[in-house]
Amino acid sequence: ASILGPHGIRVNCVAPGAIATEGLSQYPPEATKRFNNVNPMRRMGDAWDVAEGVVYLSAPSGGFITGEVLTIDGGMRMWGTVWPAGVPPHFQVY
């Protein structure tokens, strides 16, 4: 963002949380049931939640925003590390 900003190019990132898409099929059914409880809003987001964040950043409303990560997770990050499907082995502390 700092390198491209002088050229009028904005660089941002969207970081979605638990979003109800076909990607959920990668998780076991018992894990997907827990996704509704992993954030303060007590629901999963949907593709429109993410799309509206992208529109916000790309529209005139985001014209002075660069170098940012827009987290669209219903507040999940506020709760710390959440593993609704269980902690993967490579993240476990022994």
Tell me what each language-model feature is.
Residues 7, 12, 68:
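Rossmann-like NAD(H)/NADP(H) cofactor-binding core
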